[in-house]
């Protein structure tokens, strides 16, 4: 979304922004990336424009419970995923939401996501 491509995805986002949300974990990842970039102010402004049109969902107890269950299940299978990916997956699953991502490899391992 932030890179505004592909154009088809941007149109879909703009048409459906009122029905979309972002995890506070995802927002933290985006802000971290902006702060490390060579164009901090420009990237922070783009991120603010992006998330200002979305509901930012706080990570709470329900998400933490899903996180523990997902982590244990994936460890038993010997297929752990990254810490932030774990938090994001747990958050989406705990809210019964559809997760939109380019990182299919890790998120596809999460049961019932």
Each language-model region and where it sits:
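Short, well-structured N-terminal submotif of metal-dependent ribonuclease cores
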Residues: 1-22, 32-49, 76
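Nucleotide phosphate-binding site architecture
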Residues: 2-3, 28-31, 57, 108
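Flexible glycine-rich beta->alpha loop in the catalytic core of nucleotide-sugar glycosyltransferases
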Residues: 7, 98, 105
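Short catalytic/metal-binding and nucleic-acid-binding patches
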Residues: 19-22, 26, 33-36, 54-62
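Short, solvent-exposed loop/turn segments at secondary-structure junctions
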Residues: 27-29, 63-64, 105-106
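Active-site neighborhoods of divalent-metal-dependent phosphate/nucleic-acid chemistry enzymes
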Residues: 45, 54-102
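A beta-strand edge to alpha-helix "cap/lid" segment located at domain peripheries
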Residues: 81, 106-109
């Amino acid at each position: 979304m932030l890179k505004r491509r592909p154009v088809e995805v941007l149109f879909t986002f703009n048409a459906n922004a009122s029905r979309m949300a972002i995890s506070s974990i995802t927002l933290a990842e985006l802000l971290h990336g902006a702060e490390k970039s060579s164009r901090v102010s420009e990237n922070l402004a783009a991120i603010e424009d992006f998330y200002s049109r979305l509901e930012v969902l706080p990570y709470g107890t329900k998400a933490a419970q899903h996180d523990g269950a997902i982590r244990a299940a994936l460890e038993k299978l010997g297929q752990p995923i990254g810490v932030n990916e774990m938090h994001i997956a747990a958050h989406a699953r705990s809210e019964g939401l559809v997760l939109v991502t380019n990182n299919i490899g890790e998120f596809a391992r999460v049961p019932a996501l």
